[in-house]
C-alpha cells in the first residue's frame, strides 16, 4: 500500500491499481475492484464496448491513437510476444516497466467516481436504451430517417392510386365536385332557357352528351395526373347563343328543308316557354313547320 496526499487528507490505494500486478491474490483482487469502479459505462446491458474510464484528468476514451513509428514498434512487440490482442501486449509492457512506474510520482486519487460505477450494471433486457457513442448515434440517425423514406413511398402510392383506402376520399371529393358543377350549371340554364333542351337539334344534343360522358369517364379513371389535366371542364357555349340559333332555324325554315321533323312532340313546351323568350312583345314566336304537309299543299 502507498499513501496518497490530496486535499488535506491522506488516502491509500493499492500499488497494483496502477501497475496491474499485485504481490498476492488479495492485492490483485483489490486492483481489479479499483479498476472496475473507474469504468463509466456509456451503453446499457452491461456492454462496455464504448465505455470510458475515470482518470485524474476526467473521463478518457479507452481507444488510443498511436503515431506511425510507435504503432510499428508496438505491433512488432505484439508479434514477438505471440499474442493476438493488443491489450495483452500492453499488460506485458506494464509488468516489464513496473520498476520504472514505481519511481514515478503518485497520482491524486481524490477524484469523484461516477454514480453509474457504484451502482450495479442494468440487466440485459434494457438494451433499448440509446448509447452515446458515435456508432450508436449513427444507428439512431438511420432509424430516425426511416419514416421519411416510408413517407416518400406512401406519396408514390398516392400518385399511382395503389392505396385503395387513401384513394376513396379523393374519388368521393371529385365526384361531389363534378355533381355540384353539373347541378349548378343545370340550375343556371334551366330558368331562362327552359325550351333549349327540347328545341336543340339532335346532332348538337348528341355532341354535348358525348362531351359530358367523356368528362365523367375521365374522372372515373382515378389518376391525379389525368384529373389535373381535365379540370376544370371545357367551357360550355354561353346561353346567349342558343336563342340566336333557334331564331335562325325559325326565321328561315327553307334552309333546313333537308332535315327531318324533330319538334313533333314539343309544341306545348315550346309554346309555354315562348313568352319568356320575347322582349317587349315585338319578337317573332318560335314557329314549327311540318315540311311534309307543306310539300303536299
Swiss-Prot record:
GO MF terms held by the record: DNA-binding transcription factor activity; sequence-specific DNA binding
Chain ranges of the TCP domain: 46-104
The organism's place on the tree of life at top rank: Eukaryota
BP term (GO), one: regulation of secondary shoot formation
Bias type Basic and acidic residues, positions: 282-297
InterPro entries reported in the protein's UniProt record: TF_TCP_subgr (IPR017887), Transcription_factor_TCP (IPR005333)
Keywords, alphabetical: Activator, Developmental protein, DNA-binding, Nucleus, Transcription, Transcription regulation
Chain positions covered by the region annotation Disordered: 1-22, 116-136, 273-297
Cellular component, GO, one term: nucleus
Localization per Swiss-Prot or TrEMBL: Nucleus
Primary role: Transcription activator. Binds the promoter core sequence 5'-GGNCC-3'.
Quaternary structure and interacting proteins, as annotated: Forms homodimers and heterodimers.
UniProt protein name: Transcription factor PCF8
Taxonomic source organism: Oryza sativa subsp. indica
